[in-house]
């Protein structure tokens, strides 16, 4: 009975799956069958021997295959970027976080050098690194085998050497097979041509500078043998190289053979030879693929001594050939044309727009590189020479608003840098914000380009903010971008200081100077002078003057350090002036008076305003001796203000007869020097 009851509760489905339906009832002997397929109805009583009708089919959903790092991606999406943290590529250690572009490059090279050394050890001793501890599997962490395992002369040995990218060994094995009378298959010969054309009949660059000694020695011997020949050739594609020799020896050639040769010649700048091979392909009534046509278009655009009309007609002829051979263009086809039109400057603008319309007409979505080439055509580097710049960038940004992109072209990473440079030239902050919003949409941030392009982008963006944005917003961007996103150049700090000056927020100048020191801009003369000028230009409340004096003392120490390291170092006149003024206003009178000695030592002439400041300080302290020293300094430099300073000493200070006589002598000496200088000037006339 129990078995029959269980069997009755089994329900069959069309999908082939049999599910055991569980029941719950009030008693053990009288289970109640619950049917959930009709909402709002009572449970149907169990009737033995009768079929259950009206049961809805259950569709089992298909199993979804998740990415192996889906959990990590989900966790990463819940965390925002920390603006106070160092870039992830560097070690989170105070001594290993770079403070300048030079240190950043050095640290990255050191890190890459360590990775390369580790990989060299793993590949040199693979038997010690057989355990795979990574989950999921990471192929690059496991040893790679570079040495061929097949020793005999066979086509399999040739295929192995091709797979290992052994250019010279592959050519030697091919020659041995021909000498033995063995016919190499067309597929293997084409693979050998792929290898030779890709590397230009040269050995691939060594992954490790301290590896493959024999390979380097062979390269040196080859360089000595071909030294005279290489001087006569303009490009790296050598005439009658192994690729051309093997191509000529092939008893049978197919379209792949010709296409490989064409792409290899274009890659290594043998444009005329590539066009000749294409003519041979047409004579043999073969068709090229889209990648070969892309290479041919590139060859047409790089041929010298041709006018725009000739180049454009040649490109149109190639497009007609594609139609005749039923080859559908791809994104790279149009991007190659647009990149070639950049060499035509303003003449290429109308054809570029025609190309863009044609792309959209046949359903090819433009990439960031497409718009990069168009912006490059319409906005030259010097926009100041153009009275009415084009407005096409506004149309482009409106079209790209809110879209996400994936890398499809090598020039995709150049779009954001060029777009932000145009925003900077147009002085349009709203457009810059629009470009930055696009950068932060989805994963577009990954397409900002390599480190130099990324630095140019953020430098242009932040400089534009400093010039046109309110100071509170500027400071917010400053904290958000520096140093977590990019390391600022000293000109970035100068722009920020000028923004503080416009907003009358000079109390932040000492903090900006402190930050600039952290980024290795301590000895930048333009930055130091800008900081001192802003602090010394106007008078401020006493507590702020004290902070300015402390900052001036810090800057003075940098000049002293520079003077100690460079014996021939000469103090500039303006910093001496500014530091002395700041010391006087900040209550550091003794240090200010010592600055006068530096004027004499470095033969710099103080300004009249500085001498007046010293006289005011002497009057405030009631020191007649200090006032006379100021007059002596003016007299030593034969300054016209010396006489008025002497009169001020007599009027504002208590002067004894001896001091009064000294002042008179200084005045007479100063006047006689002035007369002699005027006489010499009249004699010269």
UniProtKB/Swiss-Prot annotation:
Coarse class of the protein's main subcellular location: mitochondrion
Region annotated Disordered, chain positions: 663-685
Keywords assigned by UniProt, alphabetized: Acetylation, Mitochondrion, Repeat, Ribonucleoprotein, Ribosomal protein, RNA-binding, rRNA-binding, Transit peptide, Translation regulation
Gene symbol of the encoding locus: Ptcd3
PPR repeat segments: 150-184, 185-220, 254-288, 289-329, 330-366, 367-407, 412-446, 454-488, 489-523, 572-606
Residues with PTM N6-acetyllysine: 127
Localization per Swiss-Prot or TrEMBL: Mitochondrion
Name of the molecule in the record: Small ribosomal subunit protein mS39
Any GO BP: mitochondrial translation
PANTHER family to which the protein is assigned, alphabetical: PENTATRICOPEPTIDE REPEAT DOMAIN-CONTAINING PROTEIN 3, SMALL RIBOSOMAL SUBUNIT PROTEIN MS39
